[in-house]
């Protein structure tokens, strides 16, 4: 779960830049927060038509938590996990074609922590998130997958599933 200050800007980034789809929303007005679940894979209507569960059959989901009115508080911020004291600091998204993914990110005018051509590791890139906290999106290619993207928070290697 990632807490976000501005749900609209966060959803725009993860959907428009990272290419995720909003899979489900859970609103809790009495508690003052909403949950947004994003991921890759078929839309609910496509999945249902093919007889699969559209949420549980995803390779991974990203949960965004938005507390009401935080976007209107100029002094409100979350710790990003990359500054001291360090903690959870990035999200890993594996792609089949890193060059194509980086070209897409260039077209979307993302900010980079590490471009594919920077440094010694040529099989990984870091995109800065749109959040003021600058959470990273880690984009490696060494994770085999058949889907367009694979979201795996732990960045553990996974075997491609046979279809």
Regions from the PLM with identified roles:
Residues 71-75, 145:
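Short acidic/His/Gly/Ser-rich catalytic and metal-binding motifs that mark active-site loops
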Residues 5-22, 104-107:
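Amphipathic alpha-helical segments
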Residues 56-58, 82-87:
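Short, low-complexity disordered segments enriched in Ser/Pro/Gly and basic
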């Amino acid at each position: 779960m990632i807490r976000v200050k501005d749900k609209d800007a966060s959803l725009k980034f993860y959907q428009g830049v990272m290419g995720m789809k909003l899979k489900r929303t859970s609103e809790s007005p009495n508690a003052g927060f909403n949950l947004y679940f994003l991921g890759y894979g078929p839309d609910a209507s496509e999945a249902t038509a093919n007889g699969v569960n559209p949420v549980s059959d995803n390779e991974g989901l990203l949960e965004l938590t938005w507390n009401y009115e935080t976007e209107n508080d100029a002094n409100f911020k979350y710790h990003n996990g990359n500054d001291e004291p360090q903690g959870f600091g990035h999200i890993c998204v594996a792609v089949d074609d890193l060059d194509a993914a980086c070209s897409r990110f260039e077209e979307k005018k993302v900010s980079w922590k590490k471009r594919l051509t920077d440094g010694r590791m040529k099989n990984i890139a870091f995109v800065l998130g749109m959040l003021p906290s600058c959470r990273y999106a880690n984009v490696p290619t060494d994770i085999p997958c058949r889907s367009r993207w694979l979201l795996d928070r732990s960045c553990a290697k996974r075997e491609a599933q046979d279809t």
